[in-house]
Structure formats: C-alpha cells, structure tokens
UniProtKB/Swiss-Prot annotation:
TPR repeats lie at residues 48-81, 212-244, 246-278, 279-312. It comes from Homo sapiens (Human). The keyword Metal-binding applies. Pfam families: LON_substr_bdg, zf-C3HC4, zf-C3HC4_2. This is LON peptidase N-terminal domain and RING finger protein 1. One of its GO terms (molecular function) is zinc ion binding. CDD domains: RING-HC_LONFs_rpt2.
Length: 773
C-alpha cells in the first residue's frame, strides 16, 4: 500500500507533493477508510430501514407482492432478521390466503348457541370441556390450559386482550408489550379458577372433570419432556375413553416429541376429521411438519389456522419465523420445498410458493409500485437444511379418512391439506350461502338449512349430557354477600364471584376480596366489573323463575332510588347555587355509593346542603347535576357538578350511611305589575354595575383564582323572570363573595328576586367601602 502524499511549499513559492511519513500515512489511511465505511454503513442502514417501512406500509395496504419484495430487499441490504417485525406481512399473507379460497371472515360465535349445558360449559379457546375455568377481565371464561399455553392473544368473542402467561412475547418493536394491569394481575395469580364455575363443573359432570384432570397431568409430562411416560398415559386414557380428543392431541404431541411424525399426523388427522374447524389442531399439525423439515407444508397449515382464527398467537409467531428464514438472501434463491406431500392422490394441486402468491395477489389487489431491486425467482428446490430427515412427507401422511371424497369435488384446497381438512374450506364456502355443514354420527357431511335442528350435532366439544333436575340447586348461585341469587355476577382475579353492586360496595371500604382478603387494587383501578357471561347464562337457562323474582326486587330498589322528591340523597358538605359549578372530591365510602347510585339510576342528581348542628343538615339546599366523574385508581373520584333547582327539606332520613330527604322545589314569585317590573329592572341594572365594578377592582391574584374556579361572570339577562331561580349572575356573585354561609343560606331560601338583589347590594356596598380604604 502506497503512502499518501502531503503538499508542501518550496522556497520558490511553488507547491510540490512529498510522501508523508510512513507511520502517519497508515493512520490517515485507516482513518479515512473507516470514515468512508461508516458513511456507507449509515447510508445502507437508512436504506434498509426505509425498505422495511415500505414493506410494512405495502402489507398494511394489502399489496403482498410489493411487501415481500421490499422485505427481501431490506434483508439483502443488511437489515437484521427479526421475525417480530413481520406482523403486518403475516396479516397480509393471511388475508390473501382467505381471498384465494373464498373464505369469509369467521363471525364471533355466540356463547351457548348450541344449547345444553354441554355447550355452555365449554372452553371458548380449545372448545373442550371447561376444566378449571378462569374468567378473564372481559367476563368470558376459558380453561386454564388455554391461558397457560397462550393459544390466543385476544378473546374469541369480544377480542379483548387475554392475560399473558409469560412476559416473553415481544411486539413489533422487539420490546415486551405491557399488558393491562388487570390482565397482568390475573396472570400473576397463576390464573385462579372461578370457584363457582369450577364447583358446578365438578358437580354436574364428574366424569368429564376427572378426564380433564388426567389430561392436565399429561400436559405436565409433556412440558417436562417425559414423552415416553406421556405416551403410555395417553394410550391408557384413550383405551378408557376413545372419543377424548384432547387426550388424542396430547398423544400426537408425545409422538412428535419421540420423532414419530407419522403416528402424530394420524392422530391429528383423526381429530380434524371430527372437528374440521379447530385452529389448534392445524397448528399442532404444522408444528409436526415443521419439526420434520417440511416448511412449505407447515406454513400452509399455520396459514389455515390463522384463517380460522386470526388471533391464534403461536401460529402467527411460527409464520413470522418461517417468513424471516425464507426471505434471507441465502434461502430466497432456493425457495420452498415442493414436497412429495403435494403429489399425494388426494391433494393433486400446485405447490405453495411465494412466486405464485405474488402473481395472484397482483390480480386480487392493485399493482404495487415498482421496486428498485428485483426479488430472485422462487424455484422448487428444497430449502437448505430442511431435507435432512429420514421420513418423507408421503410416508408421514399416508393415513386417509373414509367417505369424504364426494363432498370435496366442489372446492379447491391447498395441497398440504389432507382429505378431512378439505371439509373446512367446503364448510366456509357454504356458510357464505347461509348453510352449515354438520357431522353426523356416521361421519358423512350433510347440508343443514338454518332453522333446522338435527337430533345430534357434533360441535367443538363432546355432548356432556343434560343436567338432572335434582342437581340444580339455587344455593349454588347465591352471592355470599347479600345471600340472594346472583344479579349481574362478576368474578374477581382471585376467582370469587359476587353481585356487581355487592362487590362495588365492599370495594368502597377496602380494596380486598371480601372472602379471601386478596388485594384487588388492580381490579378496582380497572373499574370494568364485566359480568361473568357463563354464570349469567346458566342462571337464565336453569333458574328463570328465581331470576325473574330477583330482577323484580332490583327494579323496585332502583325505582325507589330514582325519586327526585322522596328519599333524595343529600351530600352534606358545602353551599351550592343554581347554574354555578361545584367540583367535589369524593372519598368517603357512603358518598362513593351515593354517587354511583345516582349514575346507575340515570338521574345523575343529588342534593347539597351545609351541615347543621341541630338537624344534621340545613333546611334549604340546591340540587347538583353530575356532568362528569373522573375515578382515581384507589376508588376515590373527582365529580364535576353544576347547581340546579333549589329545594326545602320536608323530612329527613338515612339510607346505607348517607342522608336522604323528602323535598319540595323553590321558584321565584313572579312580579306582574308593570311599575314593579320597571323598578325591579332599575335595581337589577344598578346592582349588576356595582358587582362588575367590585370584581374589576379585586387584586389580579384573587380575580384569576375566582375565574379559574367558578368561570367568568354571566352576562345580564333581558328577561329577569324567565328562569325559575332568577338571573344566573346573582348566584355566581353570591358564590364568590366572602360572606358567612348562614347569610348565603338565607339568600338561597328567598323566593323574591327583589329581596335577593337588595341583600346582594348591601353586601357589595360593604365590600366596596373596604376596597376604597
């Protein structure tokens, strides 16, 4: 390497080049090269970041081909291979997968739509028996197994976020997403089972409950990697109950753990033959194929799983990993493997590859913008490192189920789908024509028009049987606080159930469970109190008469609380005036209850009175209208109210710790004589001018505080007697004047506008003299 030259000036003034010192030359050379490389690296980094962003935007817009090209180009330019960055691409790929097969978006199922207790006591996640039920914050119930395995990211019915079992999941930015506090609290409590629902499941279906326990022990063996023991236990359980599909899935996992992929696929195919709409089975089958090295076939199964359930988190993660691996430059040229799976007699279709997907996506969507770099053509050569397996795909999938071929000629399916899996696509297409496919006992598909009721329908769970009448006991549905039938039952993170109103009243006093004393601070801060849907549905189905009587009592209590003249709730605190804002900080349990009842009944009103040494509160007060309530995490609240009608107390009372009263409303006596009206107008204008002068002469600090708390002074009104309480500025002025509350109370009780103006004039005259001094 030659040394760089250094310019120097000769004695004659001319410039000539001289070699630089060898050591310093090396320093300059390395420094200059490093700076150039840093600039080039920064430019490349900026370029691949733009490509990643471009790919994400194209994926969000539904342009699959352009998105794939952009992500592949970004990886070629040095972008880090992070699967979590491909969430939008996976969503776009699933969307195109649906379009290619005419699959409609699956509607949210209606809980209990299949009827019978077996349908009600069914997990919304795995569709199996609701063993160890856990009620999530949205009010729906899942079995503990589903929540611990994190099979779903969102609730299947309402799409609310489910509690994460671990904090290992990452979002698109690579950081762990923070779950809602209540969901995190449920996960931290190790998913406590719902005490009431668990008791009912054990009481009504002891056999199913015992089988679920055995399946739970199988899951623990698999989690510990003891596949031989799990396989032996699963085979023994299936000999006793051959129709237990959950155990059959566990046996398939045991086979997969022992590298016996053919046996695992056989079990999973048998499950799919009976339940063709079960996303988890497609995922398990995809995992088996992925472990066997057939990434292309596994990818299709993961996509089919997401097509049935877009919130199936493990499948989405697997697709992200596969896409990230396939888009790497060293793998992209080799493409997905066209396995012998696709050449099976029952699935003669073209193989799944990105090239065909991109071509079809162009016909389904608008053409994407041209990229500066082209993606290399995808070939049918195997993926590097994915074929080093002893078993072939055909030997793995050699098992076929009978009596399905005739129904599948009407629909085009993916090559990776076995015969029984094709029924899913047929079922989805028929559902668009308002028809359903049902599976009868003989295993044949038949069409059922909506409204018909078959004798026996194989849904997503086994028929658990009807409940004997002697097992239905109303005491199983009683709230432990009010000792009455559950009304709007809610379940806490610790698993206990109460009436919604009963629990709220307990939390007014302390943020702890009334039974186990576990902290419910997160539950209180969340303030959702979602009704436990399953518990309410069971009550509606099996205790309709008792529920009707309970609802009648509730309606009577609500009607009693809705009166605005009898038993009106009274907040004993300060003076309130018509049209004047009155913000309140509510922290006492009795007033928390009072405010909540005012909102729930719909009146959103209560009375405000000052305290009285003799009668607990004054004889006159003002109604307050709730405009907004801001709840604090510990249960306190800041209530924004404004004054309404004035009233006089007729009778005092007490209810649940707070004061009540029978009241009559006050209105100003109107003046009819024209001379009196003229005199009243002159007095009004004089006092208004005097009030404006007094307010303007206040110190800036006092004036700004008044404006901040009460707002600006209302304008004078043309019709003095239009409002039943007179001009609004009078009440605003009375609220800001620093006078004794007893004097203010006397003005509040006056029914004559003239007398009220005279009183205010006396006060202003007194304070104006002080200002002049």
């Amino acid at each position: 390497m030659s040394s760089p030259a250094v310019a120097r000036t000769s004695p004659g003034g001319s410039r000539e080049m001289a070699p630089a010192p060898q050591g310093r030359g090396r320093f300059w050379e390395v420094g200059g090269g490093s700076g150039h490389r840093l600039e080039r690296a920064a430019a490349e980094s900026e370029r691949w970041e733009l490509l990643l962003r471009r790919g994400e935007l194209l994926a969000l817009g539904g342009h699959l081909k352009g998105a794939l090209e952009a992500f592949a180009a970004a990886l070629r330019r040095g972008a880090p291979a992070r699967p979590e960055c491909l969430g939008a691409l996976v969503d776009c790929l699933v969307f195109n997968y649906r379009l290619r097969h005419g699959l409609g978006w699956s509607a949210a199922p209606v809980a209990g739509a299949d009827g019978g207790a077996g349908g009600l006591l069914r997990c919304l996640g795995c569709r199996g028996f609701l063993s160890e039920p856990v009620t999530v914050p949205c009010g729906h119930s899942y079995c503990r197994r589903c929540l611990r395995r994190e099979l779903r990211a969102r609730c299947r019915l309402c799409r609310d976020r489910l509690p994460p079992a671990t904090a290992s999941a990452t979002d698109a930015e690579g950081t762990a997403p923070r779950p809602p506090p209540l969901a995190a609290a449920i996960a931290a409590s190790d998913f406590r089972t719902s005490v009431v629902l668990n008791h009912l499941a054990e009481k009504w279906f002891p056999g199913q409950r015992e089988r679920a326990r055995a399946a739970g022990r199988l899951g623990e063996l698999l989690h510990q990697g003891r596949y031989r023991e799990a396989l032996a236990a699963a085979c023994e359980a299936l000999r006793a109950e051959p129709s237990d599909l959950i155990v059959k899935i566990y046996r398939a996992e045991s086979y997969a753990g022992l590298q016996e992929f053919k046996a695992a696929i056989e079990d999973l195919n048998a499950v799919l033959f009976q339940l063709p709409d079960w996303p988890e089975v497609y995922f398990r089958k995809g995992k088996v194929l992925c472990d066997a090295g057939f990434l292309g076939d596994a990818l299709q199964l993961f996509l089919q799983c997401l097509a049935l359930d877009e919130d199936f988190a493990p499948a989405k993660l697997q697709v992200q990993k596969i896409l990230c691996d396939l888009l790497l430059p060293e793998n992209l040229k080799e493409g997905l493997k066209e396995s012998s799976w696709s050449s099976l007699p029952c699935t003669k279709n073209r193989p799944f590859d990105f090239h065909s997907v991109m071509e079809e996506s162009q016909s389904l969507n608008e053409p994407s913008p041209k990229q500066s770099e082209e993606i290399p053509e995808v070939t049918s050569e195997p993926v590097k490192g994915s074929l080093n397996r002893a078993q072939s795909a055909q030997s793995i999938n050699s098992t076929e189920m009978p009596a399905r071929e005739d129904c599948l000629k009407r629909v085009s399916s993916e090559p990776v789908l076995s015969v029984q899996e094709k029924g899913v696509l047929l079922k989805r297409k028929l559902s668009l024509l308002e028809q359903d496919v049902i599976v009868n006992e003989d295993g044949r598909n038949k069409l059922k028009k909506q409204g018909e009721t078959p004798n026996e329908v194989c849904m997503f769970s086994l028929a658990y049987g009807d409940i004997p009448e002697e097992l239905i006991d109303v005491s199983d549905f009683e709230c432990s606080l009010c000792m009455r039938l559950f009304f709007e039952p809610v379940t806490t993170p610790c698993g206990h159930s109460f009436c919604k109103n009963c629990l709220e009243r307990c939390l007014d006093h302390a943020p702890y469970c009334p039974l186990c004393k576990e902290s419910l601070k997160e539950y209180l801060a969340d303030r959702r109190y979602c009704v436990t849907q399953l518990l309410e549905e069971l009550i509606v189905k099996y205790l309709p008469d008792e529920l009707s009587e309970r609802k009648k009592i509730y309606d009577e209590e609500t009607a009693e609380l809705s009166h605005l003249t009898k038993n009106v709730p009274i907040f004993v605190c300060t003076m309130a005036y018509p049209t004047v804002p009155c913000p309140l900080h509510v922290f006492e349990p009795r007033y928390r209850l009072m405010i909540r009842r005012s909102i729930q009944t719909g009146t959103k009103q209560f009375g405000m009175c000052v305290s009285d040494t003799q009668n607990s509160f004054a004889d006159y007060g003002c109604m307050l209208q709730i405009r907004n309530v801001h709840f604090l995490p510990d249960g306190r609240s800041v209530v924004d109210t404004v004054g309404g009608k004035r009233f006089r107390v007729l009778k005092r009372g007490m209810k649940d710790g707070y004061c009540t009263a029978d009241i009559e409303y006050l209105e100003d006596v109107k003046v009819e004589n024209e001379d009196e009206i003229k005199n009243l107008r002159e007095l009004h204008d004089l006092v208004y001018s005097q009030a404006c002068s007094w307010f303007q002469n206040l110190r800036d600090r006092f004036r700004s505080q008044i404006l901040q708390h009460f707002g600006s002074m209302p304008e004078r009104e043309e019709n003095l007697q239009a409002a039943p309480n007179g001009p609004a500025w009078c009440w605003w002025l009375l609220a800001v004047l620093p006078v004794d509350p007893r004097y203010q109370l006397s003005v509040l009780s006056m029914k004559s506008l003239k007398e009220r103006l005279t009183k205010i004039q006396h006060i202003l005259t007194y304070f104006s003299r002080d200002q002049s001094k």
